[in-house]
């Protein structure tokens, strides 16, 4: 018995049955009114195979989606506009929505060719947010400065430091922070606050990234598309972004995949492709 047609279509549901009726009708129409008779006969006899023949005249097949370009300044699904995501959890959630929305517009698979690069941007934003939060908290707790003073130091750091704030560059960022010489806190205390913020930001970002990848795995194996008849046929490509942020994403994606969906069920999607 076929449980899932084409790996992702539940033919036992009402909408799955309706899709099957439409599919068979479309294939009959293509065979009898669109294709040359010899080509239609070759397919029927099994000499050739025309994949997804039911969609032959309707829409494009299989799309690679550039999430970096799509997420910049936000995008519309056709049902509403979504602002640019600002955390790894939002990046993962909107990646699922993107795949789901596109699956409703075309047949075939929906692929993200630069998954590691795209999700690394989300990790970078999350890490920066966590770092500044922990930096302010540490300065308040360890030195006794008030909220306004801590916020002012963080604001100066954001506006005046030109060093890029990312996981592999925190030593240089720390030196630039000390060069600000803010009032109300010693250089020693500021360095301690920085070191503490770096460690805690890395820890909390790792946890949030795992949650994001776990949610992505669960969503892509359960969320409906095409009127509830199937889950999107999704794939992600990764392996060429060697930044710490990208490696954090893929490490947690693999861990979440290994953990499975629960009840001993192995996730079918996304198909994971390692690029070289």
What is each of the regions a protein language model found here?
Residues 2-276:
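Conserved catalytic cores of very large enzyme subunits
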């Amino acid at each position: 018995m076929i449980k899932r047609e084409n790996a992702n279509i539940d033919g036992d549901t009402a909408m799955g049955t309706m899709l099957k009726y439409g599919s068979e009708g479309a294939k009959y129409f293509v065979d009898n009114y669109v294709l040359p008779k010899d080509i239609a006969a070759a397919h029927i006899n099994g000499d050739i195979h025309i994949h997804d023949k039911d969609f032959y005249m309707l829409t494009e097949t299989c799309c690679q989606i550039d999430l970096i370009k799509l997420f910049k300044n936000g995008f519309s699904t056709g049902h509403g506009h979504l602002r640019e995501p600002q955390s790894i959890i939002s990046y993962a959630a909107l990646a699922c929505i993107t795949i789901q929305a596109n699956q409703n517009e075309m047949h075939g698979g929906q692929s993200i060719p630069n998954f590691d690069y795209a999700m690394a941007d989300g990790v970078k934003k999350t890490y920066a947010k966590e770092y500044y939060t922990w930096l302010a908290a540490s300065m308040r707790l360890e030195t006794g400065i008030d909220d306004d003073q801590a916020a002012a130091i963080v604001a100066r750091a954001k506006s005046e430091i030109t060093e890029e704030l990312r996981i592999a560059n925190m030593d240089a960022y720390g030196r630039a922070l000390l060069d600000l010489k803010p009032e109300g806190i010693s250089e020693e205390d500021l360095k301690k606050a920085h070191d503490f913020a770096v460690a805690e930001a890395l820890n909390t970002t790792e946890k949030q990234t795992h949650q994001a990848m776990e949610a992505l795995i669960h969503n892509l194996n359960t969320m409906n598309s095409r009127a509830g008849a199937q889950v999107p046929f999704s794939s992600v490509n990764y392996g060429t972004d060697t930044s710490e942020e990208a490696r954090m994403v893929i490490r947690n994606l693999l861990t979440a995949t290994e953990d499975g969906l629960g009840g001993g069920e192995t996730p079918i999607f996304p198909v994971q492709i390692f690029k070289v």
